[in-house]
């Protein structure tokens, strides 16, 4: 398990990476980071929320498809419920919101 400061640094790097990937690829999303929350809004107003839950060292995604909790396991963020990869879930949510294929590369 990471220390709290390591978790915060890792999650901030991940949030920055997501924003950079969206900007570099020109996908139609607005990103806002405030506190522990990265809000990604599609052109039609659909939101995908990515946040960190520091006490449990989890990343959470909230999207139309549902809510997901991810814990770090061997260098990957995997869903606590079904072991789905963070990037798979995020890319599916972003693709559904934008109506085009979105592929955020792993950090």
UniProtKB/Swiss-Prot annotation:
GTP-binding is among the record's keywords: no
Annotated CDD domains: Frataxin
Origin: domain of life: Bacteria
Keywords noted in UniProt: Iron, Metal-binding
Gene Ontology cellular component list: cytoplasm
Biological process annotations from GO: iron-sulfur cluster assembly
PROSITE patterns: FRATAXIN_1, FRATAXIN_2
Pfam families, per the entry: Frataxin_Cyay
Alphabetized GO MF terms: ferric iron binding
Metal-binding found in the keyword field: yes
Classification via InterPro entries: CyaY, Frataxin/CyaY, Frataxin/CyaY_sf, Frataxin_CS
Function summary: Involved in iron-sulfur (Fe-S) cluster assembly. May act as a regulator of Fe-S biogenesis.
Similarity section: Belongs to the frataxin family.
Protein name: Iron-sulfur cluster assembly protein CyaY
Phylogenetic lineage: Bacteria, Pseudomonadati, Pseudomonadota, Betaproteobacteria, Neisseriales
Annotated gene: cyaY
């Amino acid at each position: 398990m990471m220390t709290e400061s390591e978790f915060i640094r890792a999650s901030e790097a991940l949030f920055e990476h997501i924003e950079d990937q969206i900007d570099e690829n020109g996908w139609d999303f607005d990103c806002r980071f405030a506190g522990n929350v990265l809000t990604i809004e599609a052109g039609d107003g659909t939101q995908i929320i990515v946040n960190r839950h520091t006490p449990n060292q989890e990343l959470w995604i909230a999207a139309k498809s549902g809510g997901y909790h991810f814990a770090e396991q061997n260098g990957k963020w995997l869903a606590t419920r079904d072991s789905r990869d963070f990037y798979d879930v995020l890319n599916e949510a972003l693709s559904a919101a934008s109506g085009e294929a979105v592929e955020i590369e792993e950090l």
